[in-house]
A protein has these predicted regions:
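A solvent-exposed, acidic/Ser-Thr-rich amphipathic alpha-helical stretch
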Residues: 32-86
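Short histidine/acidic/glycine/proline-rich micro-motifs that form metal-
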Residues: 22-24, 52-55, 97
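Low-complexity, compositionally biased segments
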Residues: 17-18, 40, 54, 101, ...
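Hydrophobic alpha-helical core bundles mediating ligand binding, dimerization, or RNAP-core interactions
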Residues: 13-20, 42, 65-69, 92
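Short, low-complexity N-terminal intrinsically disordered segments enriched in polar/charged residues
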Residues: 1-40
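A beta-strand edge to alpha-helix "cap/lid" segment located at domain peripheries
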Residues: 1-8, 62-129
């Protein structure tokens, strides 16, 4: 079994982002994709700060993922427009486009320790086309 605790912040972020791209397509089981990500990359005590509220733990991450799945129902791939990491911190800018909605201002930040995301901030605005 691979040792995930010794990964750099960038390695954790890259793994998280690669798994997030697996949600593409309506036939994908979003909960399975999220569970895989939780097991590999997310602390059980994670705190997620969003413009929709503060969420805690695996249950909070799952709630947020399901909400995002409803807001972006075509489940197209995310476009990662900027990715960086330094020390324990990482930052992501992202966008999403489908037939009826778009996100142009996605911005997430991450605090990563011992190979897991312990704090994440998320901001995005869903626009109807």
């Amino acid at each position: 079994m691979e040792n995930l605790k010794n990964r750099t912040a960038r390695e954790v972020l890259d793994d998280h982002l690669n798994l997030a791209q697996k949600w593409e397509g309506a036939e994908v089981d979003l909960e399975t994709v999220v569970r895989d990500d939780l097991e590999r990359n997310v602390s059980q005590e994670i705190v997620v700060l969003t413009n929709r509220g503060t969420l805690h733990g695996y249950q909070g991450v799952m709630e947020l993922a399901l909400m995002l799945g409803e807001e972006l129902p075509e489940h197209n791939a995310f476009q990662y427009t900027y990715v960086s990491a330094e020390g324990r911190m990482a930052f992501l800018e992202w966008a999403h486009v489908d037939a009826t909605t778009r996100v142009r201002d996605g911005a997430d930040s991450y605090l990563i320790e011992d190979g897991t995301i312990i704090v994440q901030t998320i901001h995005y605005t869903v626009e109807q086309k």
